[in-house]
Amino acid sequence: MRRRDFLTATALAGTVLPLQRAVAATTTAGNGRKFVFVVNYGGWDPTRVFAPEFDNPNVDMERDAEPAAVGGLEFVDHAERPAVRSFMETWASRSLVLKGVLVPSVAHENCLRLCMTGTTRQDASDWGAIAAGVVGADFALPHVVAAGPSYPGEFGAFVTRTGTSGQLPALLDGSILDWSDVAVTAPSSRAETIMDRYLASRLRAWNNQVAGGRDTILGQAHATAHDRALTLKGLREIVNWSGSSGFGEQVDFAIDALALGVSRCVTLSFSHNGWDTHVYNDLYQSQNFEVLFQGLARLVDLLATTPGTEGGTLADETVVVVLSEMGRTPQLNSGQGKDHWPYTSMLVVGEGVTGGRVVGGYDNYYYGRPVDLASGEVDDGTGAAVSSDVVGATLLRLAGVDSETYLPGVATLDG
C-alpha cells in the first residue's frame, strides 16, 4: 500500500474571528493543535520577502523588486521568486506575518535559543518541547526533530531526533545491532513477537499487583514506553523515518508523523545555500527564499489534503511556524552582503491565526515598531516590542499551555 493511501485509509475521520484578532481565543478540541516548526538557521533578510521597505531611504532594497499585496498581506515581489508570489496568492488568507520581531542578540547561537525558548538560559525548553510535554505526552513521539535545533530542557523524555545517520530507523528495524563492535544476532520476527507479548503480559501483571508509590510510577512508565515501541514498530514499513536529508523528505516525514498520530510537534530545518549572507546577500537570499517557498507550498498543500486525526484535514489542526533567528542589516556592506541584525520577521500559517494580516513593522531606522498587544496594531507611543518571548508565549497559548508557567511576566499577542 502506498504511504498516501495508508494515511487516507487510517485517518480518524479557520474561521476569521471578529475584530481581526491575530490569535484565536479558543483551541481545537482537547487542545489538539499540532505544530510544525521550520527553522532557517543563519539569519534571513526580511526585506527580500516580508518587509517591503521601498519608501525607507535607510534600507537597501533590490532595484528590480516591487511591493505587492494579497488582501492585507504585503510582501516583496520579484521575478526570480515566483514561488513566493504563488504561495501568497494561494495561502495568504491563512498566513500571518510578524514584522520587526526583536531577538536581543546578534550572535547566532544566542539568537537561536532566544527565538525558540525566549531566554538564553541553558536549561530552558523550546516551544515544541513544552507543548509536547505538557499537552502531548500521549503521543508515541510527542516532539520529533527531523532536522535542526532542539532545546528539550526538562522535557527531554518527550523529544526525539530521527538522527543524521539513520539512528531512529535502525533502532526500529533492528539493524542497529549491525553497528555493534561485538557480533550480535537479532531475534527472528516470530521470536520478537513472542517476546513483545510476554513483556506486555508481565507489565500488566506487575501493574496489577503493585500497591502504589515508586513501583507504580516505574511500572506505568515502562508500560507506556512498551506501548510506544510497539506503535512505532508497527509503522516502520509505512513511514520514512530517515527523511532528514532534504527539505522535501522532511516535509513527507512531518505529514506522516502528524497524520498517523505519532507526534504533536515536528521540527524541520531549511538551509539550501545558507542564510548567513555577509557577501552577495541578494543572490543567495533570493535563491533561498525561492526554494524555501516551493517547499512551504508543498507542506501546506499536503496539510490541506491529508486527513487529520480529529476530522477534517491536517490543515484544520496544524500551525506552521517559519522562523530565522535574526535578520540582516538594512544596508549592504562593501561585499554586497548584509550583516547581523536583531530584528527579524516570522511567518505563521494555519489553524488558530487570523490570516491575510501583518502585525508589527519597521521604523525609519529599521528597528521594530512597538505594537498594542491587545489589538495587534502598531502603537509607537505606548506599545510593546514584539519580542521573541512574546511570540513564544503566544504560541504556547495556542498550544493550550499556560505560558505564565514557563515565561512568567511575559505578555501574549492577543490582537
Region locations from a protein language model:
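Ligand-binding pockets and gating/stacking loops
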Residues: R3-G415
